[in-house]
From Swiss-Prot:
Predominant subcellular localization, coarse grouping: membrane
Cellular compartment(s): Endosome membrane; Golgi outpost; Cytoplasm, Cytoskeleton, Microtubule organizing center
Signal peptide: 1-28
UniProt topology in membrane: Multi-pass membrane protein
Full protein name: Transmembrane 9 superfamily member 2
GO cellular component: endosome membrane; Golgi apparatus; microtubule organizing center
InterPro entries: EMP70 (IPR004240)
Segments in the Lumenal topological domain: 29-300, 396-398, 459-466, 544-554, 613-631
């Protein structure tokens, strides 16, 4: 078992993202978290069986989560496999975020007693008769899962049981999961975890990990309270073809299942457990050893800081150019008003009579602005709370639950913003406006989500959202979000239309012939480059956490990148808006929204590149699911960035035309 493993992709466990984000602190810094007690989570004390009490437990429960694979987007519940099942035990209640993430935590048949070591204990035995259709189906499902490298996820004391091994660069990697088994191809090639044992050599054969050696580390409480706290749980998967099924000794050749096997196949599942005191690891920093060991998530701090510095430098340049140029323009225009050449206006001042002319499709633009405002505020508040530590990473699903609840409650600003701008655009169909704000963008997302859910239902995946949860989501949408949107729209329409600093002429001004660079499409395409440049590094790690099963724990950096993205979208849009106004093109409303919103197109292109260059996903259903969920993210990002660009340009245009003298 000493052979070094190549880096195996950690299991798909997006929820672990929520459990690990904050443990390195709220802001960028050294990788070690320094240790602190998590909000909303009290440590559990354990002690020997004879000393147990209400304040000190002796029994250690092991829970199992869904199984998933790096080669498939389809996770399955533990009970979908023919493993040993718990005879009793209550399934932990799940919050909305956990259900949406597809988390399925269940009790397991593995029960331990603190400080009581056990060796080669039999859990259960599974017997398969290959001539029976039902047994053959179960066995084939098990084989397919091993072929796709499906992985277990076990939980002890609300933290993952990890499998730690050496990787190619000589470092130690701790995987928050372990595979069901592995496969030797008909050409003798060892896939995935089959490289750990030289005895795995039979061609066209599966080897199932039917035994685990578990070691639980604890830290004795130094304060007045009694007992110890668990700080780590590690395991090593093994395979044994037990000679005596009823009295296994955990020795001998590995448990092989040939593709050509026939007759009766018996698999005995066993485990050994031991305990060890660790005086170095504290309960509050017990996640450090997992986060610090992950080879794929070692962040190149210099690379990220370099990108941030470049973006800040470019943003500073844009700001300086805008301030200096505008200052000179405004001074020149105001001086000209007192001279004989006052009538010879030029540049952006020429279009003052058309700058606030209502845009085409003002209804749709106002609806997008309302939904974008909802997403913008939701993102800011969620990231801010996460950085402060209010969303406990040990409270599984807390981040997703917070985001959904915020989105539902932020229907009021969405309706208000949509109504205010629609009224300022001269719109009168207020009922249509509020209905579209309530249902258009959320409806598109829900329709996409529902189609993806139908595919998951058809595949029998545990990620399929239960019907009751879908009803609950619809209830939140229709019974809370929609009424709040109507309330916001009521106040938005009740207020007077936004007052502009200059009057709009009755006859539209003719726009002169534009150069290539000032035409709409080139400007929109160029406008998204700079914002995308400031997020693509973080985007890589976020996509890794979602699709390549890696933990993402840099909320501090993510919040900084969020702020820089807002600044960059604003300044890039303002800069291009200024150039277009100087070219006497006053159609800035849609252009400003699409300029920064085009960042979402680069996001989509990057997601396609990521799929083909980084992922190992196979199968039509998994491919459809990947791009289906990607389109939801792209739409949300489009509304988010587009709204930032519009508001920045609206503020800019209002500001510059309010400080110049117009006859």
């Amino acid at each position: 078992m000493s052979a070094r493993l190549p880096v195996l992709s950690p299991p798909r466990w997006p929820r672990l993202l929520l459990l690990s984000l904050l443990l390195l602190g709220a802001v960028p810094g050294p990788r070690r978290s320094g240790g602190f007690y998590l909000p909303g989570l009290a440590p559990v004390n354990f002690c020997d069986e004879e000393k147990k009490s209400d304040e000190c437990k002796a029994e250690i429960e092991l829970f199992v989560n869904r199984l998933d694979s790096v080669e498939s987007v389809l996770p399955y519940e533990y009970t979908a496999f023919d493993f040993c099942q718990a005879s009793e035990g209550k399934r932990p209640s799940e919050n909305l975020g956990q259900v949406l993430f597809g988390e399925r935590i269940e009790p397991s048949p593995y029960k331990f007693t603190f400080n009581k070591e056990e060796t080669c204990k039999l859990v259960c035995t599974k017997t398969y008769h290959t001539e029976k259709a039902e047994d053959k189906q179960k066995l084939e499902f098990l084989k397919k899962s091993m072929l796709l490298n499906y992985q277990h996820h076990w939980i002890v004391d609300n933290m993952p049981v990890t499998w730690c091994y050496d990787v190619e660069d000589g470092q130690r990697f701790c995987n928050p999961g372990f595979p069901i088994g592995c496969y030797i191809t008909d050409k003798g090639h060892a896939k995935d975890a089959c490289v750990i044992n030289s005895e795995f050599h039979e061609r066209d054969t599966f080897y199932i990990f039917n035994h685990v050696d578990i070691k639980i580390y604890y830290h004795v409480v130094e304060t007045g309270s009694m007992g110890a706290r668990l700080v780590a749980a590690k395991l090593e998967p093994k395979s044994f073809k037990h000679t005596h099924i009823d009295k296994p000794d955990c020795s001998g050749p590995p448990m092989d299942i040939s593709n050509k096997a026939s007759g009766e196949i018996k698999i005995a599942y066993t485990y050994s457990v031991s305990f060890e005191e660790d005086k170095k690891i504290r309960w509050a920093s017990r996640w450090d050893y997992i986060l610090e060991s992950m080879p794929h998530t070692h962040i190149q701090w210099f690379s990220i800081m370099n990108s941030l510095v470049i973006v800040l430098f470019l943003s500073g340049m844009v700001a300086m150019i805008m301030l200096r140029t505008l200052h000179k323009d405004i001074a020149r225009y105001n001086q000209m008003d007192s001279t004989e050449d006052a009538q010879e206006e030029f540049g952006w001042k020429l279009v003052h009579g058309d700058i606030f002319r209502p845009p085409r499709k003002g209804m749709l633009l106002s609806v997008f602005l309302g939904s974008g405002t909802q997403i913008l505020i939701m993102t800011f508040v969620t990231l801010f709370f996460a950085c402060l530590g209010f969303l406990s990473p040990a409270n599984r699903g807390a981040l997703m639950t917070c985001a959904v609840v915020l989105w539902v409650l932020l229907g009021t600003p969405a309706g208000y913003v949509a109504a205010r701008f629609y009224k300022s655009f001269g719109g009168e169909k207020w009922k249509t406006n509020v209905l579209l704000t309530s249902f258009l963008c959320p409806g598109i997302v829900f329709a996409d989500f529902f189609i993806m859910n139908l595919i998951l239902w058809g595949e029998g995946s545990s990620a399929a959202i239960p019907f009751g949860t879908l009803v609950a989501i619809l209830a939140l949408w229709f019974c809370i979000s929609v009424p709040l949107t109507f309330i916001g729209a009521y106040f938005g329409f009740k207020k007077n239309a936004i007052e502009h600093p200059v009057r709009t002429n009755q006859i539209p001004r003719q726009i002169p012939e534009q150069s290539f660079y000032t035409k709409p499409l080139p400007g929109i395409i160029m406008g998204g480059i700079l914002p995308f440049g400031c997020i693509f590094i973080q985007l890589f790690f976020i996509l890794n956490s979602i699709w390549s099963h890696q933990m993402y724990y840099m909320f501090g950096f993510l919040f900084l990148v969020f702020i820089i993205l807002v600044i960059t979208c604003s300044e890039a849009t303002i800069l291009l808006c200024y150039f277009h106004l100087c070219a006497e093109d006053y159609h800035w409303q849609w252009r400003s929204f699409l300029t920064s919103g085009f960042t979402a197109v680069y996001f989509l292109i990057y997601a396609v590149h990521y799929f083909f260059s980084k992922l190992q996903i196979t199968g039509t259903a998994s491919t459809i699911l990947y791009f289906g969920y990607t389109m939801i993210m792209v739409l949300i990002f489009f509304l988010f960035t587009g709204t930032i660009g519009f508001f920045a340009c609206f503020w800019f245009v209002t500001k510059i035309y309010s400080v110049v003298k117009v006859d």
